[in-house]
């Protein structure tokens, strides 16, 4: 993207294996969190943008697969991180090269390293948090304590990880889950800024073996002091304008997709949101992808195929 910005792709995988090799292996799990972290190097502001996991996008050819239209979360299944980055760059007109990927175990350790997080949860979130706690405990082989009540709560690592997985509470589905993920990242960031350099360095060292990243360890350690200079300015989800009530798209064998309305206009909006560019014109490739997706939408928009 533009000069003066550094963009990272943050990925959370639902891979059930805690080993790094398994996380980075093609076909091991989906990426249930896809978040662009954009750092403005001049103003020291950070913006977070979740790409909704069910968004229909073009996954460019890689690893023996041809170009294919899939949900964003599924790109990882085709060729791991590389396919996910290629998809984001192609469809959103970005040039991200660096990524950080975590699994459940890594997120648990990160939250515990900053001393847990405090936030408000609803009654429905409480119910689902405790449901997901059981599953997260099984996946990671960790013990846990259920969260006793709604309202203002203190969550430890495994509880916060379960919170990030909730998608059925309060009728918000994946949009709500993406928002919860960004909320936890924001809280981790704020807690990290309150630590001293030594504490923060120790915390990061403690999670590195559960993180897959393109950034060399020495560079990560070197970047730690600058954490204190940055602030979280804003966060949102992509696509901004969307339609997520279609049951199926038989042409590409997809159920319950999210359509960007349209991809082209959403990409223009994204570049305004992240980089302050007015009237951004997406590439001709994005316009073609956008037109194809719009045609799929038009063809499959009929009463029996729409959730009421």
Protein language model features and the residues they cover:
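Non-catalytic, solvent-exposed segments at the cell envelope interface
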Residues: 1-308
């Amino acid at each position: 993207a533009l000069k003066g910005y550094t963009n990272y792709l943050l990925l959370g995988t639902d891979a059930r294996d805690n080993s790094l090799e398994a996380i980075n292996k093609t076909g091991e799990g989906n990426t249930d969190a896809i978040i662009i972290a954009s750092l403005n190097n001049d103003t020291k502001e950070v913006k977070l943008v979740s790409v909704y996991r069910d968004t229909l996008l073009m996954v460019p050819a890689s690893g023996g697969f041809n170009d294919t239209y899939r949900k964003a979360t599924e790109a990882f299944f085709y060729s791991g991180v590389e396919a996910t980055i290629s998809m984001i760059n192609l469809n959103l007109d970005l040039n991200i090269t660096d990524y950080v990927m975590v699994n459940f175990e890594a997120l648990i350790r990160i939250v515990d390293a900053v001393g847990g997080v405090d936030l408000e949860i609803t009654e429905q979130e409480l119910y689902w948090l405790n449901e997901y706690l059981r599953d997260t405990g099984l996946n990671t082989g960790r013990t846990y304590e259920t969260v006793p009540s709604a309202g203002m709560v203190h969550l430890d690592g495994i509880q916060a990880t379960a919170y990030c997985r909730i998608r059925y509470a309060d009728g918000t589905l994946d949009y709500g889950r993406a928002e919860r993920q960004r909320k936890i990242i924001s809280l981790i960031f704020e807690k990290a800024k309150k630590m001293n350099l030594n504490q923060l360095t120790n915390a990061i060292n403690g999670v590195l073996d559960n993180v897959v990243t393109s950034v060399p360890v020495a560079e990560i350690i070197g970047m730690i002091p600058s954490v204190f200079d940055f602030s979280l300015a804003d966060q949102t989800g992509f696509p901004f304008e969307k339609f997520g009530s279609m049951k199926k798209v038989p042409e590409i064998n997809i159920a319950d997709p999210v359509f960007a309305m349209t991809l082209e206009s959403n990409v223009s909006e994204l570049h305004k949101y992240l980089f302050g560019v007015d009237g951004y014109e997406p590439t001709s490739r994005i316009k073609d992808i956008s037109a194809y997706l719009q045609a799929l939408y038009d063809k499959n928009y009929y009463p029996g195929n729409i959730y009421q």
